[in-house]
């Protein structure tokens, strides 16, 4: 039987406010346990929550960026459940009327055969809520410690429709969402610190069946790699269970990165289990049109708009434009390079950024902001390739690595001069070298004239070797063809 995978994601995005959503306590990461917990966060009697305006504005920003509806009036609700790190016995969230409704995110997905296709993922909602505290299970002689520093941290929970049909699509969506919230500046995107966490709702059904299968929710996935591994394992587990004649039970599961397996944590709750009701301590959130338009006017150019501009202005492919706008820092770097080399060299600049620069960044595990070669320095190297001072191959093999290592303060001209890498510009000298190559390789000349194209490439190689790689390959080709008739 053929199976179809159905995936929906819920993403908890920590908003980049300096203080918590309902108190003035700091949200800074890494403080000593329980040093950033106010009476509101601790749920002490007689204290009331006060909504953080900055959290609301970040939610509006996100809603506008995805083409969603911003609710003119939304309500905060109490989500009731008992857990040691939830001191109130309930979490303040939004249920019936969220602040952000609908919207979509378009993603680029790499298929199984390497082809890239586009897909639009519809969003159900995004709602504001507070985070819970943290339970610590180590170093307490078998007991659990509670750190409430995180309690009350502002979250925007972003929920998709069950639109994704593979782990690859889910990861592509998560990466696109991560890029967007970081681009907007509403989240720092630090997955190691818990600023961006995904829950994956996964089910399978026979191909062609309209009804959804029973879903299981994989909680708190804090890396794209874990997201992919967890979904792939869960999908195969569910298929095996069904094919062995067992029914899938709705459940919340955890992913163990050490074993690569998911395991059930508890029976999955439904909404009625949480006994949602409007929070009597908070007034409804009212957002007028003027507020929305003010926030809209402060939005940066969005990734989708920039992608379209890169295609029309610089002649890039949709895939290249998507890659270069994966982060605001990368897009800014690229535009800074193009500003120096001109639109005519926009494509070579893109190739360098997605090729050699990206390879070095990945090798060292750093972001483009930390790249030792700055935009102006890379632009100077591209200019030397364009004016024929060095070949593209020499630039890649000899000049760029030296720039990255900080030789001559990363100055391309100084490195070219110091290493003697400048291409030959004397046509007469090059013609003499080619004459010598032809005389020394009579057999290759005969083979070429007999119709063997490989012989021509061999002659080009010999000429480049004779010039120690300093000749312009295009000029070598031209002169050889001229002399060979």
Curated annotation (Swiss-Prot):
For this UniProt entry, the molecular function terms from Gene Ontology, in alphabetical order, are: asparaginyl-tRNA synthase (glutamine-hydrolyzing) activity; ATP binding; glutaminyl-tRNA synthase (glutamine-hydrolyzing) activity
Disulfide bond positions: none
SMART domains annotated for this entry? GatB_Yqey
Q: What is this enzyme's catalytic activity, as reactions? A: L-glutamyl-tRNA(Gln) + L-glutamine + ATP + H2O = L-glutaminyl-tRNA(Gln) + L-glutamate + ADP + phosphate + H(+); L-aspartyl-tRNA(Asn) + L-glutamine + ATP + H2O = L-asparaginyl-tRNA(Asn) + L-glutamate + ADP + phosphate + 2 H(+)
Q: Identify the EC number(s).
A: 6.3.5.-
Membrane spanning stretches: none
Coiled-coil ranges per UniProt: none
Q: Which InterPro entries match?
A: Asn/Gln-tRNA_amidoTrfase_suB/E, Asn/Gln-tRNA_Trfase_suB/E_cat, Asn/Gln_amidotransferase, Asn/Gln_tRNA_amidoTrase-B-like, GatB, GatB_C_1, GatB_Yqey_C_2, Gln-tRNA_amidoTrfase_suB_CS
Top EC group: ligase
Keyword set for this entry? ATP-binding, Ligase, Nucleotide-binding, Protein biosynthesis
User: Which biological process terms from the Gene Ontology are attached to this UniProt entry?
Assistant: glutaminyl-tRNAGln biosynthesis via transamidation; translation
- HAMAP family assigned: GatB
The protein's matches in NCBIfam families, at most eight in alphabetical order, are given as: gatB (TIGR00133), PRK05477.1-2 (NF004012), PRK05477.1-4 (NF004014), PRK05477.1-5 (NF004015)
Which protein family is it in? Belongs to the GatB/GatE family. GatB subfamily.
Task performed by this protein? Allows the formation of correctly charged Asn-tRNA(Asn) or Gln-tRNA(Gln) through the transamidation of misacylated Asp-tRNA(Asn) or Glu-tRNA(Gln) in organisms which lack either or both of asparaginyl-tRNA or glutaminyl-tRNA synthetases. The reaction takes place in the presence of glutamine and ATP through an activated phospho-Asp-tRNA(Asn) or phospho-Glu-tRNA(Gln).
Quaternary structure, from the entry: Heterotrimer of A, B and C subunits.
State the name under which the record lists this protein: Aspartyl/glutamyl-tRNA(Asn/Gln) amidotransferase subunit B
- Organism equals Cupriavidus pinatubonensis (strain JMP 134 / LMG 1197) (Cupriavidus necator (strain JMP 134))
Name of the gene this protein is made from: gatB
């Amino acid at each position: 039987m053929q199976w179809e995978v159905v995936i929906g994601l819920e993403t908890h995005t920590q908003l980049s406010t300096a203080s918590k959503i309902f108190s003035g306590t700091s949200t800074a990461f890494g403080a000593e346990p329980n040093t950033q917990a106010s009476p509101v966060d601790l749920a002490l009697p007689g204290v009331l929550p006060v909504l953080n305006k900055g959290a609301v504005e970040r939610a509006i920003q996100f809603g506008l960026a995805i083409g969603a509806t911003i609710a003119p009036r939304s309500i905060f609700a109490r989500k009731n459940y008992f857990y040691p790190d939830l001191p109130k016995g309930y979490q303040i969230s939004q249920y019936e009327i969220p602040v952000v409704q609908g919207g979509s995110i378009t993603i680029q997905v790499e298929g199984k055969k390497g082809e890239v296709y586009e897909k639009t993922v519809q969003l159900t909602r995004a709602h504001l809520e507070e985070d819970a505290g943290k339970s610590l299970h180590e170093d307490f002689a078998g007991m659990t410690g509670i750190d409430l520093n995180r309690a009350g941290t502002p979250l925007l929970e972003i929920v998709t429709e069950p639109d994704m049909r593979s782990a690859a699509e889910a990861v592509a969506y998560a990466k696109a969402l991560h890029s967007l919230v970081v681009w907007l500046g509403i989240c720092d995107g630090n997955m190691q610190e818990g600023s961006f966490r995904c829950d994956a709702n996964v089910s399978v059904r026979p191909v062609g069946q309209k009804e959804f299968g029973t879903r299981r929710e994989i909680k708190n996935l804090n890396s794209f790699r874990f997201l992919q591994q967890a979904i792939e394992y869960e999908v195969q587990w569910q298929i095996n269970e069904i094919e062995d004649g067992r029914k899938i039970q709705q459940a919340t599961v955890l992913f163990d990165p050490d074993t690569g397996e998911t395991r059930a944590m508890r029976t999955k709750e439904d909404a009625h289990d949480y006994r949602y009701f409007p929070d009597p301590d908070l007034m409804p959130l009212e957002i007028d049109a003027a507020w929305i338009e003010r926030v809209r006017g402060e939005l940066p150019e969005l990734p989708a708009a920039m992608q379209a501009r890169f295609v029309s202005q610089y002649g890039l492919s949709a895939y290249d434009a998507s890659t270069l706008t994966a982060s605001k820092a990368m897009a800014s770097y690229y535009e800074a390079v193009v500003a120096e080399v001109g639109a005519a060299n926009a494509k070579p600049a893109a190739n360098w950024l997605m090729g050699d620069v990206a390879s070095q960044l990945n090798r060292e595990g750093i972001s483009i902001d930390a790249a030792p070669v700055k935009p102006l320095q890379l632009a100077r190297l591209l200019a030397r390739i364009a004016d024929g001072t060095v070949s593209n191959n020499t630039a890649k093999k000899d000049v760029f690595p030296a720039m990255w290592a900080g030789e001559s303060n990363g100055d391309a001209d100084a490195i070219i001069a110091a290493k003697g890498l400048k291409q030959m510009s004397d046509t007469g000298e090059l013609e003499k070298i080619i004459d010598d190559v032809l005389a020394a390789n009579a057999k290759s000349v005969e083979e070429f004239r007999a119709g063997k194209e490989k012989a021509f490439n061999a002659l080009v190689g010999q000429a480049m070797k004779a010039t120690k790689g300093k000749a312009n390959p295009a000029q070598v080709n031209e002169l050889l063809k001229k002399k060979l008739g």
